């Protein structure tokens, strides 16, 4: 099974993947985030945040309040399963999480929590056999 994925978020506020599948056979899963754009992180920064679908809006709202210094993620937010730091153009970051944190049949969302980005920059993550 492929236990990692590469995803890019660009200056046009788009992720290059709308869906990520994670195999149950993976113990851990790694997301490699790349920003192929040119704009700095304070202007057009992107991160990759994973929550349950139902938790996305709350995590986005609290993340905005947390600010750039906290990567637009509320400190110790139990709703956030995994997240990268906020990166700017030309930068990369990775995050690895335990697949045991995912439940079969649950709907998971990934998104960028930079203010105003999540409406366009989001996708679905699924646990598969």
From Swiss-Prot:
Subcellular location(s) of the protein: Periplasm
A molecular function GO annotation: copper ion binding
Family matches, as InterPro entries: Azurin, BlueCu_1, BlueCu_1_BS, Cu-binding_ET, Cupredoxin
One GO cellular component, as annotated: periplasmic space
Pfam families noted in UniProt: Copper-bind (PF00127)
Primary site of residence: periplasm
Domain Plastocyanin-like: 1-129
Residues reported to bind Cu cation: 46, 112, 117, 121
Keyword line: Copper, Disulfide bond, Electron transport, Metal-binding, Periplasm, Transport
Disulphide bridges: 3-26
Keyword Transport recorded: yes
Gene3D superfamilies: Cupredoxins - blue copper proteins
SUPFAM superfamilies: Cupredoxins (SSF49503)
Protein role: Transfers electrons from cytochrome c551 to cytochrome oxidase.
PANTHER family, per the entry: AURACYANIN-B (PTHR38439), OUTER MEMBRANE PROTEIN H.8 (PTHR38439:SF2)
Protein name: Azurin-1
Species of the source: Alcaligenes xylosoxydans xylosoxydans
Lineage: Bacteria, Pseudomonadati, Pseudomonadota, Betaproteobacteria, Burkholderiales
